[in-house]
Amino acid sequence: MKKPVKIAILILLIALIAVLIWFGNVMMGNPVSHALASKAAKAFLSDRFSGTDYQMERITYSFKDGRYHAFITSPTSIDGDFSVCFSMLGEYCYDTYDSVLDGWNTAQRLESEYRKLTDTILNDPALPYDNTQIYSIMFGRLEIYPKEAFEDPNATDVPEYAILLEDLELNKIYNIKELGAKAGHLILYVDNDTISVEETARIMLDFRSMFDEADIPFYAMDFVLRHPRTEDGKSDDEEIRINDFLYQDIYEEGLADRIEIAIEQTAAYYAMLDQMK
């Protein structure tokens, strides 16, 4: 083999190795950068949180942003977890400690607890309504918003019954059922062959009965009754859609009339949103 050819092959191999190293560095990081980020994270804790029991749980590389993320925890604070981001050179980028101070960690904990509570019904295999399809939507949430959202004149999706974020106390153990009674919100999409106000009333009463029997309170319900999708995943446009139907209004006498009014109010709400676009 001629010398120029050997040199060309060698250059090609070196270039290929360089590309593989670069690709591996981008996808998985490297030990040197990991060590730099780990050292920087320890220095960050020493500088910012000296005298506390905060500790670094782990540090991982994210190929999505090409940075290292140190996850910080406290054994005495259920809402104290946050993360710190570092570059591959160990330079500080940002941290999420504000989510501890402003109450979002507490809000997420409470919402997760309420979600788990409602999932005991909505994810139960014995549930008489199908919640196993990829397009199925059935869950419960706590409505929690910051003061700025309540005061924003352009905010259209903040319910009056929502909990004020600033009222939450860090690390406080709340009665989730009591919060659910004040701000629990069920979002239910039910597939049914028959789309009618009567079927809507029957199914809403059924859900109220299930939640009452399980002693899982909620304050309001979003309810959509629609046809099942075809085998190819297509659906038609016929549906009944209701937003924020209150728990206290889900009782048999006059329910159909209240549903009719709620359907009109929901349609008007979406028409208003369309005009705002």
Model-derived features with residue positions:
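Short, Lys/Arg-rich N-terminal segment immediately upstream of the first membrane anchor
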Residues: 1-5
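Hydrophobic membrane-insertion alpha-helices, especially the h-region
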Residues: 6-25
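Short, non-transmembrane alpha-helical segments in secretory-pathway proteins
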Residues: 27-57, 109-123, 202-212
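Short glycine-rich, low-complexity/disordered patches
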Residues: 47, 51-62, 123-142, 214-230
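Exposed beta-strand-loop-beta-strand "reactive/processing" segments of non-cytosolic proteins
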Residues: 53-86
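A short, surface-exposed beta-strand/turn
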Residues: 80-101
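Non-cytosolic head/periplasmic domains of membrane-anchored proteins
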Residues: 95-195
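Extracytoplasmic/luminal low-complexity segments enriched in Pro/Gly and acidic/polar residues
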Residues: 200-277
